[in-house]
Amino acid sequence: MLEGLDGKTVFLGGGSYPGTLDYCKNENFAEKNGILTAEGALWLAQNHLERALYRSRVLVCGYGRIGRVLSGLLLAHGADVTVCSRSALSKTQALFTGARHTDFSGLEQPGDYDLVYNTVPHMIFTKRELQALRRDTVLVDLASFPGG
């Protein structure tokens, strides 16, 4: 397809080809995209969770652009949020906002969550962890390849 666009500038998300610009490499775009993704993820929960977000038990895996914003939105709605991340900094940040924290070893026992979000772009859920979730748990995978 790109061969037919000689002399044209092509914007794309993810990838590097001659004559193209990857908008995902623009930090301003990536930050705003994370906000929109988090808002969309919140909408999904509000429309598919069979209860209010208020006092729902929510696990947010990953505390990058999307995870940070999403956790804040969920906390603002009164959800009981647990953030799963690996760095000491993200743990401190999550706890400071009022969320709980677990590391990835905590995924072996996914607990009694009403809602689970994955934003980690690596495979973190095995068949065992997925089978340990309650049948009514809503799982929203927001991760990019190869984790999503």
Language model segments and positions:
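Glycine-rich adenosine-cofactor-binding loop
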Residues: 52-75
